[in-house]
């Protein structure tokens, strides 16, 4: 074999060996990657729907890095699938309520840029609670705050912050609204936002940050909604809306919404005569609301919503210690569970209550005539026995010398049960405090507890003489 042939032979053998090594390396790489990906493969949903790993549903952002012959392969482990809330756990057993949050918005407004608001409420997603309110399009230390006692102007917007964070200049304006409701279905937020002319308002339904549906006024007389959280069960959210007279017959309808789309509308049925500003809570498998009768009754209407068949029933809270303001004194007040009591029914205030077996927990102003003070208590038999008046576990939330306002309920799911919480609106400014030209509020929040608790009073606390005019 001559030298040239030797060179060719050696080169061919080397090339063959190199090719074999290269193919083996590829085989090893493919096998390793296949085994690695198979190990962390996510189970597909039963309906074979594509489940993208979007930031809004990732609970833990874990990355696996595997080094193979100087090649880096990254694969994100699929997160736990997010499910609709069903609220099927039992209601927590409580002995009363413990302090939870206070935002001190009015006190902070004396030296900072804080929004002028009213109609606040609280609602929670599966991991965190938020406070909402209807802003007046201005901060308090601003001449635009003059005459903000008016409810419906085109500049009002729904504000949203983490609970305990006052509505500062960086606060998100969720939508245009002078009446609203919000709730989280387990996957995303739904906001119901009403704005427009009194005789031809529009309700916009915003889901996951996008406008999905809308509905116009059906009675041409101030379309309005709850001013507290709506409730979603297995992807169906319910919201109570009223259009019509505030001191006479009105048209109340219950809307059923799925991912922002109206799927059904049911008229109010049952014995309730007038229903506004409902405070709703999940009562699996349905939704229960305690509302405001602004026409005939100082006892509060109850609206029961069947999420499965869209049926509605209504009546009144049985407790003879009634929850609205104004009202008769406790010795002369009445409720027969079925009808309005025709006791100082016109005007009223938003409030709440919830059933506990045959009993009822409730909150109300301490004053029977005005929005002053705030108290909570349990009425034995107050859910099932007409005119029951046996009161236990009374607590003062705001003493009678200080102003209160609207109040409402929200629910929080723990590992074993569903807790009930409430907020109280602490109104300041006009009409009562005429030194200033504005009207605004702060809030205080309490939640149910199975423990012991003390006493106190948690008013707004701002010195009106130190406030901007």
Curated annotation (Swiss-Prot):
Residues 91-469 are annotated as: Head of neuraminidase. The active site is at residues 151, 406. Residues 1-9 are intravirion. Residues 36-88 are annotated as: Hypervariable stalk region. GO terms for molecular function: exo-alpha-sialidase activity; metal ion binding. N-glycosylated. This is Neuraminidase.
């Amino acid at each position: 074999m001559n030298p040239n042939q030797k060179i060719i032979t050696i080169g061919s053998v080397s090339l063959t060996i190199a090719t074999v090594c290269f193919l083996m390396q590829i085989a090893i790489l493919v096998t390793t990657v296949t085994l690695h990906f198979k190990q962390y493969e996510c189970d597909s949903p039963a309906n074979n729907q594509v489940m993208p790993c979007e930031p809004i549903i990732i609970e833990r952002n874990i990355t696996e890095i595997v080094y193979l012959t100087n090649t880096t392969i990254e694969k994100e482990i699929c997160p736990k699938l997010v499910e609709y809330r069903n609220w099927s756990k039992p209601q927590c057993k409580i002995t009363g309520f413990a302090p939870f949050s206070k935002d001190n918005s009015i006190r902070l407004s004396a030296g900072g840029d804080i929004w002028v608001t009213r109609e606040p409420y609280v609602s929670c997603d599966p991991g965190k609670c938020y406070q909402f309110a209807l802003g007046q399009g201005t901060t308090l230390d601003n001449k635009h705050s003059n005459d903000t006692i008016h409810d419906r102007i085109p500049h009002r917007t729904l504000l949203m912050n983490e609970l305990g964070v006052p509505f500062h200049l960086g606060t998100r304006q969720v939508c245009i609204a002078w009446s609203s409701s919000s709730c989280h279905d387990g996957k995303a937020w739904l906001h119901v936002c009403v704005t427009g002319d009194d005789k031809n308002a529009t309700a916009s339904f915003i889901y996951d940050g996008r406008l999905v549906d809308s509905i116009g006024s059906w009675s041409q007389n101030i379309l309005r909604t709850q001013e507290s959280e709506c409730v979603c069960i297995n992807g169906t959210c319910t919201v109570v809306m009223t259009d019509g007279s505030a001191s006479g017959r009105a048209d109340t309808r219950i809307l059923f919404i799925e991912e922002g789309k109206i799927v059904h509308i049911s008229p109010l049925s049952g014995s309730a005569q007038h229903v506004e500003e409902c405070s709703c809570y999940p009562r699996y498998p349905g939704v229960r609301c305690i509302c405001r009768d602004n026409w005939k009754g100082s006892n509060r209407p109850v609206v029961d919503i069947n999420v499965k068949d869209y049926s509605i029933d209504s009546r009144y809270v049985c407790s003879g210690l009634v929850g609205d303001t104004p009202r008769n004194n406790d010795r002369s007040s009445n409720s027969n569970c079925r009808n309005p009591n025709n006791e100082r029914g016109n005007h009223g205030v938003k409030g709440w209550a919830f059933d506990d077996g045959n009993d009822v927990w409730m909150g109300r102003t301490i004053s029977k005539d005005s929005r002053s003070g705030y108290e909570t208590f349990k009425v034995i038999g107050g859910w099932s026995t007409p005119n029951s008046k046996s009161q236990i576990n009374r607590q003062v939330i705001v003493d009678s010398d200080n102003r209160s306002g609207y109040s409402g309920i929200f629910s929080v799911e723990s590992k074993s049960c569903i807790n009930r919480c409430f907020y109280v609106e602490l109104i300041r400014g006009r009409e009562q405090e005429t030194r200033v030209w504005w009207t605004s509020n702060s809030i205080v929040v309490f939640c149910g507890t199975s423990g012991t608790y003390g006493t106190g009073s948690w008013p707004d606390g701002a010195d009106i003489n130190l406030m901007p005019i």
